[in-house]
């Protein structure tokens, strides 16, 4: 329903100095003339100018607030339609009253993300940029914001366009040979195969950025695990620089998970303090320990916390053996006490690791630990040096489908099958790739994407 006019409050709920009501559609200018009276008796409003005056209720004529207004004419607006923004005082009642006046004047309440959806449908932005709008709003760390702004500026779209151009080049070569076999000299098979192999490599390189992009967008989860009384809760408090977990000398104080996010070098890392792992007949403790192993199985990284003031026991060695194969960082706590634990025993269990000594009590080694946590989660994600990352499962699935079709085209040509089979694969690859920027996307996918937006954006 792009022909109707929509409106919504565009600023967050709550009180503030300024609030914004946004209107988009063909009736935006009419609504402005109906509700607004300029303090300088202006009746013809120039686009992109700010005007000061009173905004009144259309039914009673009562002044609602003293406001500023700005009209932006299609197509040079965010949505590509006539757009009106009303800047009023940021009180809840004021904003609701202004919005109600606008709705009474012919607009309807916008759906979540409908302004950005209209921007996409009116070719102001592509779908990767539309998704990036939501990511910019929801970004909680500098890396997440950096990745979102990259997409908003069109860098992912440029990469997708480049891949699309390469696919079209191959498609032209194949289909020309099919349609004009007598008039067109078909390029050597090695030339087409070379182009397809390069395409496959480029697609693989972009796909390999997904894990890193996902960490930047959603953050990572790191579980602190170990025996009771190794200082897991103290370490969590030290990393957070606040007393979040209860710390006592009594082993087994922590039974439930305690989770809190911290920002490490621009990446959001959710730290999880867990119950101590040890043999027990206590049913509650047994259930807590079972849940610890479930958390460990889904974590992006594990901090194995050991007590440096004690030698390894047989019980310790059983836990260490079970943790082999995890993305793990051995950390030895209580560096402020006499060292009894031997590093070589830890390295023997986890070859290639470099155990880090810390003192959660005095903060010793915590700065280095944060650096190692960053390396731990980014190393698993496969940190990339390129400028463009994908961070959406939707993008990943579309790229995987594209790569699959390119691989099938390669196989067809290598097996000496008709060029028509390869041409069909390339057409399907183009369709899959077009889903990313929205060229071949369905209404269901659009509904799913924009339903996660806030109203007013």
Swiss-Prot record:
Transmembrane segments: none annotated. InterPro entries: G_TrmE, GTP-bd, GTP-bd_TrmE_N, GTPase_MnmE, MnmE_dom2, MnmE_helical, P-loop_NTPase, Small_GTP-bd. Its EC number is 3.6.-.-. GO terms for cellular component: cytosol. Its cofactor is K(+). It is found in: Cytoplasm. K(+) binds at residues 229, 248, 250, 253. GO terms for biological process: tRNA methylation; tRNA wobble uridine modification. SUPFAM superfamilies: P-loop containing nucleoside triphosphate hydrolases (SSF52540), TrmE connector domain (SSF116878). GTP binds at residues 229-234, 248-254, 273-276, 333-336. Residues 219-378 form the TrmE-type G domain. Mg(2+) binds at residues 233, 254. (6S)-5-formyl-5,6,7,8-tetrahydrofolate binds at residues 22, 85, 124, 457. Pfam families: MMR_HSR1, MnmE_helical, TrmE_N. Keywords: Cytoplasm, GTP-binding, Hydrolase, Magnesium, Metal-binding, Nucleotide-binding, Potassium, tRNA processing. Binds 1 potassium ion per subunit. Exhibits a very high intrinsic GTPase hydrolysis rate. Involved in the addition of a carboxymethylaminomethyl (cmnm) group at the wobble position (U34) of certain tRNAs, forming tRNA-cmnm(5)s(2)U34. Homodimer. Heterotetramer of two MnmE and two MnmG subunits. This is tRNA modification GTPase MnmE. The gene is mnmE.
């Amino acid at each position: 329903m792009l022909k109707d006019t929509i409106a919504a409050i565009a600023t967050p709920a709550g009180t503030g100095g300024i609030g914004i009501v946004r209107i988009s559609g063909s009736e935006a200018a009419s609504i402005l003339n109906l509700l607004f009276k300029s303090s300088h008796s202006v009746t013809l409003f120039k686009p992109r100018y700010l005007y000061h005056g009173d905004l009144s209720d259309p039914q009673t004529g009562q002044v609602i607030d003293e406001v500023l207004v700005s009209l932006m004419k299609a197509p040079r607006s965010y949505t590509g339609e006539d757009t009106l923004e009303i800047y009023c005082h940021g009180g809840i009642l004021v904003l609701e009253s202004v919005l109600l006046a606008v709705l009474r004047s012919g607009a309807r309440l916008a759906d979540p993300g409908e302004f950005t959806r209209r921007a996409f449908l009116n070719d102001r932005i592509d779908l990767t940029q539309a998704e990036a709008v939501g990511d910019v709003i929801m970004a909680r760390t500098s890396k997440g914001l950096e990745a979102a702004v990259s997409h908003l500026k069109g860098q992912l779209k440029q990469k997708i366009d480049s891949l699309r151009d390469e696919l079209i080049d191959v498609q032209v070569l194949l289909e020309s040979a099919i349609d004009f076999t007598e008039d067109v000299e078909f390029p050597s098979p090695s030339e087409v195969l070379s182009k397809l192999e390069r395409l496959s490599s480029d697609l693989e390189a972009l796909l390999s950025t997904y894990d890193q992009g996902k960490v930047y967008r959603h953050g990572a989860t790191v579980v602190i695990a170990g025996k009771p009384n190794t200082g897991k809760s103290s370490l969590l408090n030290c990393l957070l620089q606040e007393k979040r977990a209860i710390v006592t000398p009594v082993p087994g104080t922590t039974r439930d998970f305690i989770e809190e996010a911290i920002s490490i070098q621009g990446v959001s890392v959710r730290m999880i303090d867990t119950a101590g792992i040890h043999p027990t007949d206590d049913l509650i403790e047994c259930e807590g320990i079972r849940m610890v192993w479930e958390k460990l199985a889904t974590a992006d990284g594990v901090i194995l916390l050991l007590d440096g003031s004690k030698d390894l026991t047989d019980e310790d060695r059983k836990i260490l053996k079970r943790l082999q194969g995890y993305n793990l960082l051995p950390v030895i706590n209580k560096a402020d006490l006499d060292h009894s634990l031997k590093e070589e025993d830890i390295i023997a269990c986890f070859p290639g690791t470099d155990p880090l000594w810390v003192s959660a009590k005095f903060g010793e080694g915590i700065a280095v630990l944060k650096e190692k946590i960053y390396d731990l989660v980014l190393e698993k994600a496969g940190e990339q040096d390129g400028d463009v990352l994908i961070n959406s499962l939707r993008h990943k699935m579309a790229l995987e489908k594209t790569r699959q079709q390119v691989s099938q085209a390669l196989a067809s040509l290598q097996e000496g099958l008709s060029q028509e089979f390869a041409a069909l694969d390339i057409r399907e690859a183009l369709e899959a790739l077009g889903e990313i920027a929205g060229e071949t996307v369905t209404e269901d996918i659009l509904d799913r994407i924009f339903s996660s937006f806030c109203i007013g954006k």
